[in-house]
Amino acid sequence: MMAMQLSEAADVLQGRISGEDVAFRGISTDTRTPASGALFFALQGPNFDGHAFLDDARRQGAVAAAVSHRCDSPMPQVEVKDTRLALGQLGEYWRRKFSIPVVAITGSNGKTTVRAMTESILSGCGRALSTQGNLNNDIGLPLTLARLGPEDRFAVLEMGANHHGEIDYLAGLAHPTIAVVTNAGPAHLEGFGDLQGVARAKGELFARLEADGTAVINTDDAFAPLWRELAGHCHVVDFGLDNDAAVSADWKGDTGGSDVRIRTADGEIEVRLPLPGK
């Protein structure tokens, strides 16, 4: 879990401290939940302003606050230009302290299921940090990154979006080493214009990979050629049921789940999944 002095956070965020240079552990954005020892970020939105709730954050255990203007509170504060952007900056700073495989997953459908299954598989080799609930946006992802600790061997991060540039921003915080796009479908079309726009937005994840990263591409999706183009600078592993792919499978489902024979260059394996659906 994130742990540092307030002065270190201020240096990262180019902020100004008022009050004591305290040590904090973890970050919080919600005064309705416990925040023992945490740095509270006073976020603002159309219908709320976290700056009005510093006393509530303090009662929940927060020891300091990140604010966009000085507040009348005994809590030490670090003043930044934009608390929402600062939340992301601090999350990225903390993520860079860990040299572990980071799997980022997005897509119109199935990303939560794929994230949960990936976490389950990797947990057999060591502790895997994973996105909790729906914390897959520009607030939730930094909160997830802040939970990284020395005991984590992997991170599995879900990313959601409803407009262009959002996945690019999230990937810029997480620095994934492996990127997975499950598919592109007609979800949130109002934010992307059309299905091509959805596919390009999801493909921002591949474009953000470093040259030594791995893009995992669904060859059954009509936009696989576009994603291959966006991932042309890195390693690609493709998968599919209906096309020739590096990882392919035979699938048979019933009301109780699915029987799958998975084929790879290293051999085959048969698994029974207690999940309906293809």
Give short role names for the model-derived ranges.
Residues L195-A199, C234-K278:
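Adenine nucleotide phosphate-binding catalytic loops in nucleotide-utilizing enzymes
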Residues R70-P74, D221-L226, A246:
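Short, charged/polar "capping" segments at the starts of alpha-helices
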Residues M1-Q89, Y93, E270:
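N-terminal leader/targeting and accessory segments in enzymes
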Residues L87-T219, P225-G232, T264:
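Phosphate-binding loop of NTP-binding sites
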Residues I17, Q77-E79, V102, R127-S130, ...:
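Conserved beta-strand scaffold positions in the cores of enzyme catalytic domains, especially
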